[in-house]
């Protein structure tokens, strides 16, 4: 089925984001890339590594968007609970994906490192998802077709997330969603504050059709 809605939500998962230990650059990058595809991000949510909090965020996102991108919580340690929560959310069980398992074995063989039990668990994925290959790391991405909403779960490591999104997610989005063309035009002004400019063009701005949006982005230049 083709989705006609072009609204998306981004959910970032991880205590390290909420306590300010790391800066969430994934959302900004995803927002830009989704915008290029004609998909508007209307909501961003950050939640802790807590099953109940993640489950609530997944439920609420479905009321707002037809595409939900989730990053984080796919690592091999016990605090990474995203995959288990998604399995419960979709009433699914975790199964071993043989392709992922083989890829994990190749990685650890190349690195000449032993595989721990926690590493093997990264080959476990919800039975109901489409696995998104991660050639840049060990945690695969996952694509879930919900009743009205598509959920995509990606690793929180930026370069892994970007690789999977570009190579695996974008082609699926183009196939699944009816995407509008979006054009951005920048008009630069100098010597006038945004409030004065807004007053001058108020009548023109009010006459714009609903599908055309105007944003004021003031920048202050300091000459040294």
Enumerate the language-model features and the residues they cover:
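ATP/NTP phosphate-donor binding region
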Residues: 7-55, 59
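Proline/glycine-rich low-complexity loops and linkers
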Residues: 53-56, 80-177
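An anion/phosphate-binding loop that grips the pyrophosphate of nucleotide cofactors and donors
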Residues: 65
């Amino acid at each position: 089925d083709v989705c006609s809605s072009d609204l998306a939500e981004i959910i970032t998962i991880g205590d390290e984001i909420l306590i300010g230990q790391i800066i969430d650059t994934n959302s900004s990058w995803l927002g830009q890339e989704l915008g290029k595809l004609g998909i508007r991000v209307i909501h961003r949510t950050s939640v802790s590594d807590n099953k109940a909090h993640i489950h609530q965020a997944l439920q609420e996102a479905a009321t707002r968007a037809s595409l939900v991108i989730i990053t984080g919580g796919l690592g091999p340690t016990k605090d990474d609970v995203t995959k288990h929560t998604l399995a419960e959310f979709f009433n699914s069980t975790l199964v071993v994906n043989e392709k992922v398992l083989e890829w994990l074995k190749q990685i650890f063989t190349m690195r000449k490192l032993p595989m721990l039990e926690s590493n093997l668990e990264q080959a476990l994925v919800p039975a109901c998802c489409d696995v998104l290959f991660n050639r840049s790391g060990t945690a695969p991405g996952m694509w879930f077709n919900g009743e009205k909403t598509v959920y995509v779960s990606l690793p929180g490591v930026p370069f892994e997330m970007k690789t999977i999104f570009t190579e695996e997610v974008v082609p699926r989005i183009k196939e699944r969603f009816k995407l509008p063309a979006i054009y951005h035009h920048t008009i630069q002004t100098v010597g006038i504050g945004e409030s004065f400019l807004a007053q001058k063009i108020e009548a023109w701005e009010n006459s714009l059709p609903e599908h055309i949006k105007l944003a004021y982005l003031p920048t202050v230049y300091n000459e040294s």
